[in-house]
């Protein structure tokens, strides 16, 4: 093989004729074709469709590159031949608009489409089709064929279905952590090795019918802690809330009788377990009696809520499904590789009479779960992994023989799939490694094994619901020695109180059952350990480089010595509703044992108490807090003080149902009114609200990438912050410290009040409160400086992808800045979001849903999953395999993968906030060596909705949505732009525009045309195709070489703040200065405070000399000879008129061409100067020019001799003034000009000759200066050039007084 030394097409073709085959020759020729066709003239041709649809949505190409499929608003799909442009097939059958369409990459003639009513159809162009409907008729958002397998991925709502179309329905489903996290896009790479998913980021989402709940002070600290853990916040209105409210309207109580099954794993259902030992039968019967005692009939099916349905119809088909036993426990050395076992199920459930017929082989018992227990850094939105077996730890003794029993006893207490985090894990970690990186499971469920499983059994779907734990605070099974008749609630008249009493009764009954189990078992130490597991899901951390494992000790149980006692994170605030004050108030529980501090030191051992009646009291922990004492003593039930569960209350501030505890002591408890009578609440709320707003602003101001840094994203490096962000950070720290002092003062007063009312318990109450009841603010403020070290590989990790961080390059234009306001007037996120919502509503009211979706605050995360082994993606985990954290997606055309699978193009929100926000087209690398690295960027407005990479991956096309009504008649309209990827990591210069795609528009059409999808034709140099909102399907092909287009685009692509000098003659014919503005154009210019350019000449105030205006732009600056003063004075009228006649026509033709492309032109005339700003249709081609007029006396002044230097030097002398204005915070337009008749100033005339135009530099990323609000986007790009004349010297050559 001979390597081609150079890119010489003639030699390559000559060698190919002689039979020589050079390596890479084919690719070089294809690249050459792409480079040459960009200079050719492109002609668009409409495809004649059968019934003239109103809109065209998506395009897809067949694998043989001969057919083009398009979806339309008339519910049909049309198949067009690419070469001839003729429609050859019409696929009719959808009841609503098909929203997505795709060809099978390898099977010819196979098309899949999904419509808005939840129907998926697979069409065979040779005849026939298969269809499947979603259960809830949710719209189909995206479809993806696997290139080699008979597999179709269906994205709908928050689920991804896996369908083999030879079956009647999908065989597996994975779900996100909540219904708010909708799946918007699924895409395989060209080889099918990796899967790309786009899922809504839940942090800025709300339901359609869910009101916005502000974050108050009690939740703000936990919001900050979740940000530290790099996990998404818990949704504040859990599904269980709706479920309990639905049950509260009934006269009956809570139905908890049936076996609760959690759709939590992706593994097939295991067979029923073997017969239980005789020691377990009494417990089972006791539990059955309890279940019958508290069970009530329900009449309504609630399966649509995503919760376990308890109605008779659904529960009749349910069978208890138990955890598999594990006969042997791995040694301590094998903890890191021991997979966890999860409770699994399939739907629909097998009836009891069919259980024996559906038994599988015993090998499935040991199948690991799809996703193992995830560490604390991602615990906020991970699986509720009900792992009661050995999860990466060894449990010595007979404990390993009872996981099924404990699971069976817990499961009926779970209220459907929303029992939150029953066994949430928080791993022990040293102080230096307090934030472990997220990880996926060591072994995932294989789709092939699922298929084999179902071939031998039923056709049931494997539903893997990783719904984030919300609702019930599953803080474990609190044990009590008392009957539990005390209550801290006085709201007996409310429905919540009745519901709470029912729940309290259930918990008390359940606690009695636990005491019965303990007395029957007689295994006190093992019971304690299992109880701790049920409460905390203690998981030993994999030893890190600086974290040595604790030596194994039989009496200390090293498997427990490195764990934490972790309460449910949803149970961090214990608030009760006080009817007297009509507010939720904090209860400060006291605990009989245990110490805690603000450090992250882990306990070294647990000491088992050999008392047969001992129980583990619940140790309340705030979120993320860990006890640091070396020994945690297990107190017996005979201790003087003990907690009691008195019920469950709904916390309106945090949106959680939370268990309420009270203290059982000899002297009784203190009432809520007495505890809170002296506590100031208003100032705390004000501080919390102020701190919340500051934190929200700081997050947006800093734009700090926490994944690539070892610092907390809330507290970034001050050197990288703007002044406004730095001020917000300091205020947050100050308010946090003040809140900590207030909390300590409140606790001191509470302790003093308790000691005065309960003298018997005062001896041991003080240390317990000071140690255990540590508030979160104390903990965070004291420890955040040592804990904010997130590992560099915390962003992306998977077994096959390796652990790395995609490199993010903070280019100068993407660094944080204070926004479009001055820093003291910087709006917060709430104001900014509100304005964007208003803009989005206005745009969508005009039918522009694509632009509205980009303006809205919705963002998506792109995750990259390894699919080589057909493992189900863990889409419930929002922090693993994240390729792009935030991007904008409108439809399947908003994201594209190159044909070679090496590049990914997507739209991401800009760090610079505006109204509306800008967007950035970002091209990322998918290569293994730099996966996730941002290579190319380009700024765009919110009307960029479609992106397509060329077949060779060297060009990118951006499709545009319409923004406004046409202001003038036009025969062509720009609908897309094509850019060349030329310099990686070059910022705005990394892409270079090469040409625009123009849509031929009828003369009577007054509206802009939007593109819904634009795609390159699959062969290099063939052309492109796009579909519009008018129903057109247009195929553009390069027809003929355009000789002047190369030179034209070279000139047009130069930066606007560079002065160009060339020898082109300005004597160029053009259009006349006839009036061509429409009435709407004139009205719009007046509305925004600008004077439209009139054909009449302006008269200066120095005389009656009529001046003709001369307009030139900064891009095509022409150098002219400076006329002599005498010549200029003798004939100013004729000379200026002739010059303006030629040069003005050239500028006018340029303005008309820009406006034909959808741009806008503003002209401002003053007494002595004229400023013109022309903005292209997309806002990234801005021309600003300034002209200073000369009166008849100018030429004879002595100062005119000093201005006879060549024009470029004059321009350079004038350039710094605009920068000085910007530094002072003044816009060039608002700078004070010398007006005639101004008191205290002598009106002086400028000394520049009429032939010396002044170009004005324009800084595109800047937001200073006046903005032309004539368009919806890019209004903060334009700087007026009116400041250029400020350097004009007076008659004595001195700078003029400003």
Swiss-Prot record:
Changing residue 1043 to A: Abolished phosphorylation by CHUK/IKKA, leading to impaired interaction with ATG8 family proteins and reduced mitophagic activity. Changing residue 1134 to A: Does not affect interaction with TRAF6. Phosphorylation at Ser-52 by MTOR inhibits its ability to regulate autophagy and mediate ubiquitination of ULK1. Phosphorylation by ULK1 in response to autophagy induction abolishes interaction with DYNLL1 and DYNLL2, releasing AMBRA1 from the cytoskeletal docking site to induce autophagosome nucleation. Phosphorylation by MTOR inhibits interaction with PPP2CA and subsequent dephosphorylation of MYC. Phosphorylation at Ser-1043 by CHUK/IKKA promotes its interaction with ATG8 family proteins GABARAP and MAP1LC3B and its mitophagic activity. Ubiquitinated by RNF2 via 'Lys-48'-linkage in unstressed cells, leading to its degradation by the proteasome. Induction of autophagy promotes stabilization via interaction with CUL4 (CUL4A or CUL4B) and DDB1. Upon prolonged starvation, ubiquitinated and degraded, terminating the autophagy response. The record marks 482-483 as: Cleavage. GO terms for biological process: autophagosome assembly; cell differentiation; cellular response to starvation; mitophagy; negative regulation of cardiac muscle cell apoptotic process; negative regulation of cell population proliferation; negative regulation of neuron apoptotic process; neural tube development. GO terms for molecular function: GTPase binding; protein phosphatase activator activity; protein phosphatase binding; ubiquitin protein ligase binding; ubiquitin-like ligase-substrate adaptor activity. Residues 254-266, 354-385, 458-467, 547-561, 590-601, 661-674, 1060-1075, 1191-1212 have a biased composition (Polar residues). WD repeats lie at residues 51-90, 93-133, 135-175. A motif (TQT motif 2) lies at residues 1116-1118. Keywords: Autophagy, Cell cycle, Cell junction, Cytoplasm, Cytoplasmic vesicle, Cytoskeleton, Developmental protein, Differentiation, Endoplasmic reticulum, Isopeptide bond, Methylation, Mitochondrion, Neurogenesis, Nucleus, Phosphoprotein, Repeat, Transcription, Transcription regulation, Tumor suppressor, Ubl conjugation, Ubl conjugation pathway, WD repeat. A motif (TQT motif 1) lies at residues 1104-1106. The modification Asymmetric dimethylarginine is found at residue 747. The modification Phosphoserine is found at residues 52, 328, 394, 443, 635, 639, 1043, 1205. Pathway: Protein modification; protein ubiquitination. GO terms for cellular component: autophagosome; axoneme; Cul4-RING E3 ubiquitin ligase complex; cytoplasm; cytoskeleton; cytosol; endoplasmic reticulum; focal adhesion. Changing residue 833 to F: Found in a child with spina bifida; uncertain significance; reduced induction of autophagy. Residues 602-614, 628-639 have a biased composition (Low complexity). Residues 268-277 have a biased composition (Pro residues). The keyword Nucleus applies. A motif (PxP motif 2) lies at residues 1206-1212. This is Activating molecule in BECN1-regulated autophagy protein 1. The gene is AMBRA1.
């Amino acid at each position: 093989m001979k390597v081609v030394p150079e890119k010489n097409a003639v030699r390559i073709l000559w060698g190919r004729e002689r039979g020589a085959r050079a390596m890479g020759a084919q690719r070089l020729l294809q690249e050459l074709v792409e480079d040459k066709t960009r200079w050719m003239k492109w002609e668009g041709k409409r495809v004649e469709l059968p019934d003239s649809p109103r809109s065209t949505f998506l395009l897809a190409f067949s694998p043989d590159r001969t057919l083009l499929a398009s979806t339309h608003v008339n519910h049909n799909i049309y198949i067009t031949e690419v070469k001839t442009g003729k429609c050859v097939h019409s696929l009719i059958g959808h009841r609503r608009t098909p929203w997505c369409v795709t060809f099978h990459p390898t099977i010819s003639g196979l098309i899949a489409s999904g419509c808005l009513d939840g129907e998926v159809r697979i069409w065979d162009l040779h005849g026939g089709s298969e269809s499947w409907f979603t259960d809830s008729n949710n719209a189909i958002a995206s479809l993806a064929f696997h290139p080699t397998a008979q597999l179709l991925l269906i994205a709908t709502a928050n689920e991804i279905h896996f369908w083999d179309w030879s079956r009647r329905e999908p065989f597996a489903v994975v779900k996100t952590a909540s219904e708010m996290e909708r799946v918007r896009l699924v895409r395989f790479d060209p080889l099918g090795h990796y899967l790309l998913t786009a899922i809504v980021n839940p942090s800025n989402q709300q339901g359609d019918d869910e009101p916005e709940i502000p974050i108050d002070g009690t939740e703000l600290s936990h919001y900050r802690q979740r940000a530290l853990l790099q996990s998404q916040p818990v949704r504040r209105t859990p599904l269980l809330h709706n479920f309990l409210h639905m049950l509260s309207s009934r006269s009956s109580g809570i139905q908890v009788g049936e076996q609760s099954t959690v759709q939590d794993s992706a593994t097939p259902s295991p067979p029923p377990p073997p017969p239980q030992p005789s020691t377990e039968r009494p417990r089972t019967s006791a539990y059955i009696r309890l279940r019958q005692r508290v069970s009530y009939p329900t009449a309504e099916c609630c399966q649509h809520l995503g919760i376990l349905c308890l109605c008779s119809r659904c529960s009749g088909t349910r069978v208890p499904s138990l955890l598999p036993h594990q006969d042997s426990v791995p040694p301590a050395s094998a903890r890191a590789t021991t997979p966890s076992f999860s409770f699994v199920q399939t739907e629909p459930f097998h009836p009891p009479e069919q259980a024996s017929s559906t038994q599988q082989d015993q090998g499935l018992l040991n199948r690991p779960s799809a996703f193992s227990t995830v560490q604390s850094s991602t615990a906020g939105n991970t699986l509720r992994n009900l792992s009661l077996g050995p999860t990466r730890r060894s449990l010595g003794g007979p404990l390993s023989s009872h996981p099924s029993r404990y699971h069976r006893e817990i499961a009926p207490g779970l209220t459907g799939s929303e029992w939150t985090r029953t066994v949430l894990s928080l791993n022990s970690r040293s102080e230096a490694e307090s934030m472990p990186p997220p990880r996926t499971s060591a072994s995932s469920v294989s789709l092939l094994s699922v298929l084999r499983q179902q071939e031998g059994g039923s056709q049931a779907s494997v539903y893997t619901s990783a719904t984030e734990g919300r609702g019930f605070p599953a803080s474990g099974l609190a044990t009590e020695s008392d009957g539990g008749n005390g209550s801290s609630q006085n709201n007996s008249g409310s429905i919540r109180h009745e519901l709470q009493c029912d729940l309290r009764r259930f918990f008390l009954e359940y606690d009695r059952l636990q005491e019965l189990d303990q007395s029957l078992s007689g295994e006190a130490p093992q019971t304690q350990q299992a109880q701790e597991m049920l409460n905390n899901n203690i998981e030993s951390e994999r030893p890190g480089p600086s974290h040595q494992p604790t030596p194994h000790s039989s009496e200390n149980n090293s498997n427990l010595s490195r764990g934490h006692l972790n309460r449910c994170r949803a149970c961090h605030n214990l608030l009760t509703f006080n009817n007297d004050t009509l507010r939720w108030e904090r209860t400060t529980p006291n605990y009989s044992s245990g110490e805690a501090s603000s450090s992250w030191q882990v306990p070294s051992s647990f000491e088992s108490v050999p008392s047969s009646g001992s129980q583990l009291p619940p140790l309340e922990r705030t979120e993320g807090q860990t006890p640091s004492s070396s020994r945690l003593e297990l107190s017996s039930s005979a201790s003087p003080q003990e907690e009691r569960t008195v019920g469950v209350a709904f916390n309106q501030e945090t949106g959680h149902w939370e268990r309420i505890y009270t203290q059982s002591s000899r002297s009784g408890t203190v009432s809520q009114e007495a505890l809170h009578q002296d506590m100031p609440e208003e100032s705390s709320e004000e501080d919390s609200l102020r701190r919340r707003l500051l934190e929200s602003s700081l997050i947006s101001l800093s734009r700090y990438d926490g994944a690539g840094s070892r610092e907390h994203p809330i507290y970034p490096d001050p050197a990288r912050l703007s002044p406004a962000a730095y001020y917000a950070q300091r205020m947050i720290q100050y308010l946090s410290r003040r809140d900590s002092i207030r909390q300590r003062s409140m606790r001191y007063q509470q302790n003093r009040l308790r000691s005065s009312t309960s003298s018997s318990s005062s001896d041991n109450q003080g240390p317990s409160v000071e140690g255990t009841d540590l508030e979160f603010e104390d903990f965070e403020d004291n420890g955040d400086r040592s804990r904010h070290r997130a590992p560099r590989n915390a962003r992306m990790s998977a077994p096959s992808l390796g652990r790395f961080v995609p490199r993010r390059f903070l280019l100068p234009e993407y660094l944080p800045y204070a926004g479009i306001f001055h820093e003291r007037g910087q709006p917060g996120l709430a104001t900014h979001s509100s304005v964007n919502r208003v803009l989005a509503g206005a745009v969508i009211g005009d039918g522009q849903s694509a632009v509205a979706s980009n303006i809205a605050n919705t963002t998506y995360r792109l995750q990259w999953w390894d699919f080589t082994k057909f493992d189900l993606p863990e889409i419930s985990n929002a922090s693993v395999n994240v390729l792009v954290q935030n991007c904008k997606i409108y439809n399947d055309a908003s994201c594209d993968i190159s044909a070679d699978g090496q590049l990914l193009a997507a739209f991401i929100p800009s760090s610079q906030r505006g109204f509306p926000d800008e967007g950035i087209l970002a091209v990322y690398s998918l290569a293994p060596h730099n996966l996730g690295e941002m290579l190319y960027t380009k700024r765009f407005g919110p009307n960029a909705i479609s992106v397509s990479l060329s077949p060779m991956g060297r060009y990118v096309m951006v499709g545009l949505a319409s923004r406004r009504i046409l202001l003038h008649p036009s025969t062509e309209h720009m609908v897309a732009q094509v850019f060349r990827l030329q310099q990686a990591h070059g910022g705005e210069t990394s892409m270079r525009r090469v040409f625009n795609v123009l849509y031929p528009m009828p003369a009577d059409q007054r509206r802009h045309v939007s593109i819904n999808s634009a795609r390159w034709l699959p062969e290099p140099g063939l052309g492109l195709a796009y579909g519009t909102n008018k129903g057109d399907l247009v195929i553009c092909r390069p027809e003929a070489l355009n000789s002047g287009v190369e030179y034209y685009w070279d000139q047009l692509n130069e930066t606007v703040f560079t002065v160009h000098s060339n020898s082109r003659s300005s004597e160029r014919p053009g259009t006349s200065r006839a009036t061509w503005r429409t009435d709407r154009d004139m009205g719009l210019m007046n509305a925004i405070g600008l004077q439209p350019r009139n054909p009449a000449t302006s008269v200066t105030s120095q005389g009656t000399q009529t001046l003709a205006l001369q307009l030139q732009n900064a891009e095509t600056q022409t150098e002219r000879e400076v006329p002599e003063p005498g010549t200029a004075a003798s004939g100013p009228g004729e000379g200026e008129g002739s010059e303006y006649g030629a040069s003005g026509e050239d500028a006018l033709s340029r303005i008309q061409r820009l406006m034909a492309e959808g741009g806008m032109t503003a002209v401002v005339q003053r007494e002595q100067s004229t400023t013109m700003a022309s903005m292209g249709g997309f806002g990234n081609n801005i021309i600003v020019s300034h002209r200073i007029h000369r009166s008849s006396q100018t030429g004879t002044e002595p100062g005119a001799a000093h201005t006879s230097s060549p024009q470029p030097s004059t321009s350079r002398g004038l350039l710094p003034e605009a920068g000085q204005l910007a530094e002072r915070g003044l816009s060039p337009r608002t700078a004070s000009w010398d007006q005639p008749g101004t008191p205290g100033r002598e009106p002086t005339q400028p000394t520049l000759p009429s032939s010396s135009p002044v170009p004005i530099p324009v800084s595109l990323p800047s937001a200073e200066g006046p903005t032309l609000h004539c368009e919806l986007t890019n209004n903060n790009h334009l700087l007026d050039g009116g400041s250029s004349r400020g350097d004009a010297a007076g008659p004595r050559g001195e700078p003029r007084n400003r």
